[in-house]
Amino acid sequence: MVKLSLRTHPDVLFGFSNNYVELILRVENPGEHSVWTEADVAVPEHISLAPNNALRKGRIRVGIVAKNEFLEKAVRVYGNSYTQPQMYKCDITLYSFNRDGVIENRMEKSFNLRCEMKKEASL
């Protein structure tokens, strides 16, 4: 069974401006055989998976994770002028496939993305 952990870089998305954070998926495979992994990502309103339009769902092909190894894959989450400072709940569904192409495992995980006002530089 694979393990999924999530993090962002940078830690905070800034509100009311066009910027992005990278949501990084880390998939670990402690199992005895290699698996192919893909993930569905869903974001709420006012943030997007595309820089210029509203895209709320997407799929990431993480790749083949060999036994006792891990892979990391990043997806950009974009803010815009409608992105308010609050917590946004992102949903990730990870699928792992065996060598016959059959879904071996399905894992759902949520991640709270923090959005804040950008602090002005002070002297």
Task: Show which residues each predicted segment covers.
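Short beta-strand elements
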Residues: 102-123
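Short beta-strand and strand-turn-strand segments in soluble, beta-rich domains
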Residues: 46-61
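Beta-sheet-dominated interaction scaffolds and their linkers
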Residues: 1-30, 59-64
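Short, hydrophobic beta-strand segments
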Residues: 73-82
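Short acidic/proline- and small/hydrophobic-mixed sequence motifs that coincide with surface turns
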Residues: 31-37, 85-87, 104
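Short glycine/proline/serine/threonine-rich loop/turn segments at secondary-structure transition edges
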Residues: 16, 81-91
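Enriched for extracellular/lumenal, surface-exposed ectodomains of secreted and cell-surface proteins
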Residues: 92-101
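Short acidic, flexible loop segments centered on an aromatic residue
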Residues: 30-48
